[in-house]
């Protein structure tokens, strides 16, 4: 296959990737967007394998088969509840690949006669390894936190921001020396030192971020993995990899910015690491008062007597796989003429759009699934709100307690409804480790137990 045909194939693949992103931005077209992405990737792989500069095609096919087998196994094995940690670990692979490509590009380089071109190449190698290493360890930490293998609490090192700044400054100095020196031995030594710094830097960046902010971290790492892929594209002189990496990097950065606005966080503080780490609390159960318990039968009766119901799901719904009986309850209530809608917080769950994916999987109509800004004004006119597995995203302390770690974060104002039913396993705090005053309000009742079991019991009572 000639280089011209390969270039044309890359252009078609890049356009399909853009269509894929556009399709994935809406529920209605998400399946079509996925299809565009699959076709684009297939074209890119075929063009790369059959390209004029391809060598060791047999090894490439072996690697593809191994990757495909692993991918198919993961697709069949991994539950929707495990999707956040799967995304995180996949990001780590992109980062590690960029590191390996960087070292390989340096070793395989025969040098450039033009000094400027040689300096550009060395800068590409250095930055590619740095970004890849940060993405790799950052994603590994995110995977550990999301899967429960690591504590969700932030790592509070003294002078952590100064340490981050020092890592960047030292890495920049190493870059300058790396480009200026003509000693290959010194360049290898500098690359190894920089890689160690970048690995520690990536680990510290994510480890110092509080658990409640993990959805932002996932989208941020998505952006990092895109830039790592773009850096690999520069080192490999692969135009499609550069374009694809830039698409992923920019879309991830935009998503992170949107989510930061939804959480009243600074985008810079996300990149710097260590936000959402205030250790203060909003008080103990004894200080807040008593909570009231309810039963599935009582909740069913309350729902029958309601004219409007809003359901606000959270990660607890995902863990319990309660989206299917929730969809069944929605259908039954709508058949009775009750107005049922869903209120989705931008950072509900452990992944951007986590709840939307679960509800779409359960065939909940798209038009009744509303974002926080679209539904917040309607809670005061709502008879009953079902809070299923959500905690921090419905915490009134964000508005009422200036000393709360989540102070200023926009939340779903569920407490303004006539009745609030909170589905929880226990009175433990949420992922942010903050007690929720909602549980102790007069119009709130607690329904303890597994969310799926509770919803099934309500469904039977209806």
Regions found by a protein language model. Name each.
Residues 287-462:
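Structured cytosolic domains appended to multi-pass membrane proteins
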Residues 1-14, 51-69, 121-136, 184-197:
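Structural signature of hydrophobic alpha-helical transmembrane segments
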Residues 247-306:
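Membrane-interfacial segments at transmembrane helix termini in multi-pass membrane proteins
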Residues 48-61, 73-83, 99-116, 179-183:
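Transmembrane alpha-helix boundary signature
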Residues 16-29, 68-87, 139-154, 200-214, ...:
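C-terminal ends of transmembrane helices
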Residues 31-40, 60-63, 82-94, 154-165, ...:
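Cytoplasmic-side transmembrane-helix entry/capping segments in multi-pass membrane proteins
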Residues 210, 224-268:
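Mobile "lid/hinge" segments at catalytic clefts and subdomain interfaces of large enzymes
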Residues 104-116, 180-185, 216, 223-244:
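Transmembrane helix-loop junctions at the membrane interface of multipass transporters and ion channels
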């Amino acid at each position: 296959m000639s280089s011209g045909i390969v270039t044309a194939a890359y252009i078609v693949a890049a356009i399909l990737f853009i269509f894929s992103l556009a399709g994935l931005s809406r529920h209605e077209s998400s399946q079509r967007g996925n299809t565009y992405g699959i076709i684009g990737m297939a074209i890119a792989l075929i063009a790369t394998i059959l390209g004029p500069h391809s060598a060791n095609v047999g090894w490439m096919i072996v690697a593809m088969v191994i990757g495909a087998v692993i991918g198919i196994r993961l697709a069949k094995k991994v539950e929707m509840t495990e999707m956040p940690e799967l995304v995180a670990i996949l990001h780590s692979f992109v980062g590690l690949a960029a590191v390996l490509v960087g070292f390989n590009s340096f070793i395989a380089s025969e040098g450039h006669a033009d000094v400027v071109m040689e300096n550009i190449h060395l800068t590409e190698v250095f930055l590619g390894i740095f970004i890849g290493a940060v993405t790799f360890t950052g994603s590994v930490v995110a995977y550990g936190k999301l899967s429960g293998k690591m504590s969700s609490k932030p790592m509070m090192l003294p002078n952590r921001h100064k340490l981050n700044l020092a890592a960047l400054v030292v890495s920049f100095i190493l870059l300058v020396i790396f480009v200026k020196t003509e000693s290959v031995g010194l360049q290898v030594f500098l690359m190894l030192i920089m890689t160690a710094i970048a690995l520690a830097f990536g680990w510290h960046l994510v480890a110092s971020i509080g658990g409640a902010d993990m959805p932002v971290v996932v989208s941020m790492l998505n952006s990092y993995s895109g830039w790592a892929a773009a850096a690999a594209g520069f080192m490999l002189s692969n135009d499609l990899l550069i374009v694809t990496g830039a698409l992923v990097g920019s879309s991830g950065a935009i998503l992170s910015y949107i989510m930061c606005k939804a959480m009243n966080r600074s985008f810079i503080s996300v990149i710097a690491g260590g936000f959402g780490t205030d250790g203060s609390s909003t008080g103990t159960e004894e200080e807040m008062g008593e909570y009231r318990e309810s039963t599935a039968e009582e909740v069913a009766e309350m729902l029958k007597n309601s004219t409007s119901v809003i359901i606000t799901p959270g990660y607890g719904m995902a863990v319990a796989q309660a989206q299917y009986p929730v969809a069944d309850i929605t259908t039954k209530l709508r058949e009775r003429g009750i107005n049922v809608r869903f209120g989705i917080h931008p950072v509900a769950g452990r992944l951007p759009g986590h709840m939307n994916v679960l509800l779409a999987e359960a065939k909940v109509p798209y038009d009744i699934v509303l974002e926080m800004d679209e539904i917040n004004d309607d809670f005061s006119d709502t008879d009953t709100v079902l809070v299923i597995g959500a905690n921090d995203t419905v915490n009134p302390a964000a508005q009422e307690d200036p000393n709360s770690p989540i102070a200023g974060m926009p939340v779903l104002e569920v407490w303004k409804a006539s009745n609030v039913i909170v589905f929880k396993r226990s009175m433990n705090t949420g992922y942010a480790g903050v007690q929720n005053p909602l549980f102790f309000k007069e119009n709130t009742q607690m329904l303890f137990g597994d969310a799926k079991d509770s919803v099934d019991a309500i469904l039977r009572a209806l």
